[in-house]
């Protein structure tokens, strides 16, 4: 078996325009340009993830909330110091998505000070807060086996995936244990003994690849 680790789906970028004077304008604005850069992995299906914006004032109270997909190019602001949080809307629900397989979750925050009559400047990267596990099988696997599933256990979650699917987990749960179960065309079944992988990091996809011997060959990071 070969385990390959990829950097997962790149990093969202949150970029605001350079600060400059607006002598004839009252109030303040913060200009935002949200973009997503990603590297397709496991499947070529397009990835469409929007960021929401939550702005907190100096006392930690919510000053503004802008839902995902609704972030304008220019956000009117009052002068002061704020914490801008860029995140996906699934901070509390990502584990339940996709029938329990989970989904990617992104979050970052940055303090910004807005001066009266000026445009604010802010540049921040919004990384994934969780990690993913995927499965890769030999090209002719389906010709020899009628079914398969990879069982992944992490923390209190037990998730099953097939090739081409990803399951997402929390780094705080301390890694994962995985085991592949297969049934060949004659109806004979085999389940691999569970293997522990403990050194996990946020923002990565752990792609588990098998040969026909179901043995670990190498592992690249």
Regions found by a protein language model. Name each.
Residues 2-8:
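Sec-dependent signal peptide recognition
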Residues 13-16:
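C-terminal motif of bacterial Sec signal peptides marking the signal peptidase cleavage site
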Residues 18-21, 32-60:
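N-terminal ordered "arm"
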Residues 19, 68-69, 90-127, 185-217:
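Structured interaction patches on ligand/partner-binding surfaces of diverse proteins
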Residues 20-41, 125-141:
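A short, Gly/Thr-enriched small/hydrophobic beta-strand-prone motif that recurs across taxa
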Residues 29-33, 83-85, 121-123, 132-134, ...:
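Beta-strand secondary-structure signal
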Residues 47-93, 145-202:
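Tryptophan-paired
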Residues 123-129, 170-173:
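Extracellular and analogous surface-interaction loops
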